[in-house]
């Protein structure tokens, strides 16, 4: 197998007046063999390894092991998967933002650059777990429930507002917008993402890790 499998699988796609680069599984199959029968979820992971292959965190052997999964349907190593994004809800997401803030404080004490402490992947935090229903059955119920929610959790929301401004790749979906499952499916998720890297637009499939057991699985492949 070529030691430059990442480059060997790189292809281009023209969309209107923009050129996108992506990592083609059919091109990779010329070196890896038949991968057509891999589960779709593993194909997404395989593209991820091709895109991030650097010879250290992702090696030829890592890619070959995943491509050959059908031989025994068993993994003999960890998969160095980098998710396209992270989805949090407020119950588990707030402590993570507190940790990031604490890390920045530690870096500041040591004389370092606090702006370097940021999420490596884009993070969306959806505020939905603390919303309660005090009013119902009338036209003003929604607005009144949101107002009470903001009053009861004012300090939390001020902290999250600071986090949204302080950290790059971090956004907050305010209360009253909807639950994580709905917001993820209808607003946040995309089939394909694109990102400018070293002067090139790279297109890649959506993938997601979340902070609870089920939120991220809606409409998922596996």
For the regions a language model picked out, list residue spans one by one.
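Fe-S-dependent hydro-lyases/dehydratases of central metabolism
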Residues: 1-222
